Amino acid sequence: MNAIAEMPSPILFSDSAAAKVAELIEDEGNPDLKLRVFVQGGGCSGFQYGFTFDEIVNEDDTTMTKNGVQLLIDSMSYQYLVGAEIDYKDDLEGAQFVIKNPNATTTCGCGSSFTA
């Protein structure tokens, strides 16, 4: 019997996150900007998320487009973000980008760092 391996789902980039990024890009006045999401060592749990604007798409970047907004993720970060959802929340706790990551085995209290 042949078993079909289930492929990890790609990264989900919510409509609200794309809308907020589009608003920020418009505020910057540079339509060439793209949102780069990355994982780096640090934080109280070992890894932390980072967000920055970038005009350059690197050779090893995975790119996604949502509602005209381009998201960039480098190959090292991608392995930690497969299956994650990048969202933007504006509620009683404040306005912030949030990453729901199924690969994170533990997270810190603030949610900005994790262990994979």
Swiss-Prot record:
Keywords linked to the UniProt accession: Iron, Iron-sulfur, Metal-binding
Subunit structure and binding partners: Homodimer.
InterPro entries recorded: FeS_biogenesis, FeS_cluster_insertion, FeS_cluster_insertion_CS, FeS_cluster_insertion_RrpA, HesB-like_dom_sf
Its job: Required for insertion of 4Fe-4S clusters.
Stated name of the protein: Putative iron-sulfur cluster insertion protein ErpA
UniProt keyword Translocase, yes or no: no
Cofactor note: Binds 1 iron-sulfur cluster per subunit.
Lineage: Bacteria, Pseudomonadati, Pseudomonadota, Betaproteobacteria, Burkholderiales
One function term, GO molecular function aspect: 2 iron, 2 sulfur cluster binding
Entry-linked PROSITE patterns: HESB
Family note: Belongs to the HesB/IscA family.
GO biological process: iron-sulfur cluster assembly
Positions of transmembrane segments: none
Keyword field contains Hydrolase: no
Cofactor: iron-sulfur cluster
Binding-site positions, iron-sulfur cluster: C44, C108, C110
One family name in Pfam for this protein: Fe-S_biosyn
Superkingdom of the source species: Bacteria
Source organism: Herminiimonas arsenicoxydans
